[in-house]
């Protein structure tokens, strides 16, 4: 199996649907994109970038995807990000998440599992999933406001070696949100990043460390991409930020 390769939207649309069974309801990528595009047009939104990371079978057939749609905003530092996860082989439940991204590095920010609307591929999963795409776009402005305020507050929080070791260690040893490969990326970023401060800089902040870590999360597998970002943000929330309860998505048909 090949994991974390990039694919185009057309490749995802062209991937053949699996056969439906009594115990399985496919959620077509084509319908997901139609619903996303409908919300983008309806909201007058401008897409800055789209990225689709996929897992494939040994024969090169796409089986799972984590998609990120980056949306422009008037903010000079951050944009909005809409994410979805889907699979054609039962390896992943369908999921929707909303968050943000940092312009200069395109690192993602997912505040909580608030839009981790998860749905196994059964019953009315196809229609429910499309409703939750609508709900995600309806709530993205409110969530984005919270995220930008939180990210700005991280800039005011100094991080020393002890704090860095504690946070990175928790993500690696306790939560398994970063792998050994990603740990090395974090280490390299802390000393050699050309976008954020280094660990030995006197003004090294939680914002800098956050972005060093999320740079490594670009290597997360589609199955864990959302939860790895959630774990990272929640850890920083608990350490540095006073939070409110995240927005909730509808989880079933009315």
Functional labels for PLM-detected ranges:
Residues 1-37, 44-51, 185-194, 198-199, ...:
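Feature for intrinsically disordered/low-complexity regulatory segments and propeptides
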Residues 41-69:
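A short acidic/basic microdomain associated with nuclease active sites
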Residues 52-54, 70-254:
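Intrinsically disordered, low-complexity regions enriched in serine/threonine
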């Amino acid at each position: 199996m090949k994991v974390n390769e990039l694919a185009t939207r057309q490749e995802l649309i062209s991937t053949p649907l699996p056969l439906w069974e009594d115990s399985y309801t496919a959620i077509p990528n084509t319908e997901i994109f139609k619903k996303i595009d409908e919300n983008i047009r309806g909201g007058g939104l401008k897409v800055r970038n789209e990225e689709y990371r996929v897992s494939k079978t040994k024969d090169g057939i796409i089986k799972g995807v984590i998609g990120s749609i980056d949306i422009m905003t008037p903010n000079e530092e951050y944009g909005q990000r809409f994410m979805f996860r889907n699979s054609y082989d039962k390896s992943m439940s369908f999921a929707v998440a909303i968050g943000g991204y940092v312009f200069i590095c395109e690192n993602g920010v997912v505040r909580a599992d608030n839009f981790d609307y998860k749905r196994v591929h059964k019953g009315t999963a196809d229609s429910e999933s499309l409703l939750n795409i609508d709900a995600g776009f309806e709530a993205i402005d409110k969530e984005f406001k919270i995220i930008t305020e939180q990210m700005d507050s991280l800039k005011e929080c100094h991080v020393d070696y002890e704090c860095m070791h504690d946070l990175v260690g928790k993500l690696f040893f306790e939560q398994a949100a970063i792998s050994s490969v990603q740990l090395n990326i974090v280490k390299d970023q802390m000393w050699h990043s050309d976008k954020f401060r280094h660990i030995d800089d006197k003004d090294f902040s939680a914002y800098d460390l956050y972005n060093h870590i999320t740079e490594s999360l670009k290597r997360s597998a589609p199955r864990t991409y959302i939860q790895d970002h959630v774990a990272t943000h929640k850890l920083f929330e608990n350490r540095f930020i006073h939070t409110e309860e995240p927005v909730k998505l509808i989880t079933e048909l009315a």
